[in-house]
Amino acid sequence: MNQEKILKILLAPIVSEKTTMLSAHNQYAFKVRVDCSKREIKAAVEMLFSVNVENVTTSIVKGKKKIFKGRIGSRPNWKKAMVKVSEGQMIDVSRT
């Protein structure tokens, strides 16, 4: 997998109260492209952060319905990836 494709897979880390608590258990959350697979996500995280990934779980988050100036619209769907790294390794999401 080339470097350019890897950089396009991971869009942003998800930083919330829940994901901060999960980081104590070596789990990290990322917003990823909707069309990427678990294998691609695993390869991207291992290459970018130099960690060993044990497990990747993904879910599609449905976009919310919003009203703007009386018109109903919707935000796009997006994919969330929960990545579990090996014991003793960590990812510094504040730098990403």
Curated annotation (Swiss-Prot):
Pfam families: Ribosomal_L23 (PF00276). One of its GO terms (molecular function) is structural constituent of ribosome. InterPro entries: Nucleotide-bd_a/b_plait_sf (IPR012677), Ribosomal_uL23-like (IPR013025), Ribosomal_uL23/eL15/eS24_sf (IPR012678). One of the early assembly proteins it binds 23S rRNA. One of the proteins that surrounds the polypeptide exit tunnel on the outside of the ribosome. Forms the main docking site for trigger factor binding to the ribosome. This is Large ribosomal subunit protein uL23. Belongs to the universal ribosomal protein uL23 family. The keyword Isomerase does not apply. Signal peptide: none annotated. Part of the 50S ribosomal subunit. Contacts protein L29, and trigger factor when it is bound to the ribosome. NCBIfam families: PRK05738.1-3, PRK05738.2-4. It comes from the Bacteria. HAMAP family: Ribosomal_uL23_B (MF_01369_B). One of its GO terms (cellular component) is ribonucleoprotein complex. GO terms for biological process: translation. Keywords: Ribonucleoprotein, Ribosomal protein, RNA-binding, rRNA-binding.
